[in-house]
Amino acid sequence: MARQKGKMNNELSPNPLWTKDFTIITIGSVVSMLGSALSGFAMSLLVLDYTKSTFMFALYNVIYMLPNAVVPVLCGPFLDRFSRKRTIYTLDFISSALYLILSAILMLDLFSFPILAVGCFLLGTISSVYYVAYDSFYPLLITEGNYSKAYSIASTLETLAMIMIPISALVYNSVGIVPLFLFNTCTYFIAAVMETHIGAEEKYIEKQKQSSSEVSGGIRRFVSDFRKGMEYLYSEKGLLAIAIYFVFSSFAGGATGSLTLPYFKSTFHNGEYVYMMVWGMMAVGRGIGGFIHYKVRLPVQRKFVIALFVYITLSLLEGSYLYFPVWVMMIMCFCVGILGVTSYNIRISATQHYVPDERKGRFNGTFGTLNTLGTLCGQLIAGALAEFLPVRAIISSAMFINLLAAIFVIGFGAKHVKKIYNVQN
């Protein structure tokens, strides 16, 4: 009996999530996210104040996102063969240096939109490589059975970073953007130093080296890896359906992201603060949603149904909330926050658990590129249409397209998507 009881306790006791490496990557993420949230929103305000144009604001977003259309696919196969950890902390050191250079340019009064565009393009390039490396390395630091809990923490941290947005606006309106850039210089440097102390073994590198004899030469190896990555995506109908849907979701998100802040600034007095109130409730919703997912496991056999419900409801809420009074917008955005973190948690934990470690780089690279193409199309089309069409109508149309994609791509692909979503992870 004692032996059976001990065995039962072992089975019921989950693996510890908060290992040394997971703690380091989490703290490092918090530090860098805080800096990014501060400077990112301030840069958006700077572009709007400098250009006075919704289209130019959309163009700024496109310039930042453009590298994501190509770079993830190019770097994905290489990140399946080389150290993702080293890539992560190296890029954080580079980001720290770049923000220091941008600070110096602004202090020397050399600012111009072309310089800002070049800086945004470089930051976008770094970001596009970083997130493929991070998304592929992060699962290696999660102990078995803790994927859902770990990704609920990640989504909650992103939400907490949004708390810095009001501070960003206050600092920007008071003393300008330079102090925020200098703060970002420090946060990225601290995060990079912390990440150098992660000790996880990257065993997938040896696996890839052992299987690399079939292809020789850098270009031939890259072509072979990229082809295999695409073949893998097409061979997995569930992953393909998820990827296609999130292209449409990214399209709608790109349209919304490009038009919402300009809409609030042009519609309300001190519109950036009204924007923060409304979208701040979304952050609160994401925080509460993340806490719920950390404490409560979704029923395994209902995950697909929950995800489809979330996709449809998000489309309806985000497509209509701008037609209501501010207090109603806040309530609707609170709901969007809770549902958004649910969508993220189900998708990321399921796909990262499903895809083998040695294929994660290629899958995440391809998935990221497809999402970026959707976002870029949404930003460009929405920005151009906003010059002569009502902003709210454009956003509603984009969300209606997203709604149709949820029904026809995810709904009709239920048989294959369930195999990925309805799994304990």
Task: Put a short name on every predicted segment.
Residues V30, S112-V129, V328-T342:
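Hydrophobic core of transmembrane alpha-helices in multi-pass small-molecule transporters
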Residues T54-F55, E144-A154, E272, D357-F367:
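Loop-to-transmembrane helix entry/capping segments in MFS-fold secondary transporters
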Residues V70, R81, K85-T87, L91, ...:
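C-terminal transmembrane bundle of multi-pass solute transporters/carriers
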Residues S13-L48, F121, Y234-A255, F334:
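Pair of pore-lining "gating" transmembrane helices in MFS-fold secondary transporters
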Residues V30, V175-L182, R221, D225-G290:
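A single, central transmembrane helix in multi-pass transporters
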Residues M43, V129-I142, T342-V355:
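Intracellular juxtamembrane helix-capping segments at the cytosolic ends
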Residues Q4-F22, E201-A243:
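Juxtamembrane intracellular "pre-TM" segments in multi-pass secondary transporters
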